[in-house]
Amino acid sequence: MKKLLFSLVALFIGVSSICAQMMELPLDPEVRVGKLENGMTYYIRHNEKPKGQASFYIYHDVGAIQEEDDQQGLAHFLEHMAFNGSVNLPEKAMIEQLETIGVQFGLNLNAFTSWDCTEYMIKDCPVAEEKNLDLALLILHDWSQFISLQDEEIDSERGVIMEELRTRDGAGLRAQNDMIKNLFKGTLYEHRNLIGYLDGLKSFERSSLVNFYKKWYRPEYQALVIVGDVDVDQVEAKIKALMADIPASPADAAQKEVIMVPATDEPIISVFTDKELTQSSVMMFARREALPKEYQNTSVGYSYNLINSFVSVMMGARFDEIAQAADAPFLGGGMSEGSIGICPTLESTMFSATAHEGRTDDAFRAMYTEMERMRRHGFTAGEFERAKQEILRWSERQYTNRNDVHNDSYAQRYLDHYAKGTPMMDAETEWQFDQMVINQMNVDVINQAY
């Protein structure tokens, strides 16, 4: 389906002189984007929502999928250790100093680890005083290459993470892990659960954690994002000076493996049961190779994703109508298009439905019927027009609220641009482009694609 959809989009945008030749979309001129000599990327933007504050992020384009078999859980463990001392801020000094200026650990100061990325953030940091700006940048610097990883802190954190593992080990997580094992069968994703396993967390050597850190926390896999009430020139100068002691990686440094999920000749069928689950649900995934990153910030990529949005909106309306009927076959359901959020090389068309108690078969039949109805008959002109108006209204709201965008919303756009290559246009250009492409779309394009 992806090849057909890609061809249709290329044909569709070919009628527009603005979109001709797979035009690369312009970047917002209000954001300063650069790359240091060591390979580290940075994004800086002045924004006063809220005034007097800024948010600071460092994105590492590595995660649990980079672990060796004897390092399972260490990407997440390393994330915890980033708050337990660094070269310039030993032990709990980072947390203590930030708390004196109103930045609270767990609320404004946080991080997360995924399969393919690790992200650290300092949100809503007051920056009227330059020393606070300097502190936040110093923390980003230390998170890049200068986490201490002291033995006593590692041993102390083992208990914290083992308790987290026990606390999180509920039916929802077990169901998620089972789904991942089936969706990504035959790849490393099948064997990585982010937090690791009890035996490994108890017994891993410090050297394993250090090896993971030194091997993968490198500047060419890192991006800084600073958005807030700051002087862009000043912040850029500070970044260049402060990050200068982070060396570029050697030519023979390890490279990330691009993991492709193999196709299967037969459908993968999985039934997961757990006495702790309170509801039954059914899901169907049609997997496909993701749109390449280099196409995302182009007119082709934009139109490709727009077609997916149209289909999701129209199918959502169908599922909502069914769920609201008397004696509906399911409580709710829908369809989503695009990334599953785990493996960057895989996309899917996903149908789902939540079943009434004892009526799982009914939910599946109704869901499958809607999938087949879409595949065989497509959509009507009326459905398309309603979806078009909904998408246009959403786009207009984005434009209307363009002067009220929070620091973290801008930051997320820039993080997505770095990680996924998604568009980063200014509000005026995006609004004009939306109107042009949405109004150019028609139901025949959608139906041919699906």
Give residue ranges: language-model regions.
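Mature N-terminal segment immediately following signal peptide/propeptide cleavage
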Residues: 24-58
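Active-site-adjacent, His/Asp/Glu-enriched structural segments that form or flank metal-binding
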Residues: 51-52, 60-175, 203, 208-221, ...
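Sec-dependent N-terminal signal peptides
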Residues: 4-14
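Scaffold signal of the M16-like zinc-metallopeptidase fold and its non-catalytic homologs
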Residues: 22, 84-86, 111-116, 132, ...
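Acidic/histidine-enriched alpha-helical segments
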Residues: 91, 95-99, 147-166, 231, ...
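An aromatic/glycine/proline-enriched structural segment found at the starts
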Residues: 24, 186, 223-280, 389, ...
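Structured mid-domain segments that build the active-site/substrate or prosthetic-cofactor binding neighborhood
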Residues: 282-284, 289, 301-381
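His/Glu-based metal-binding/catalytic segments typifying zinc-dependent metallopeptidases
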Residues: 251-319, 352, 408-422
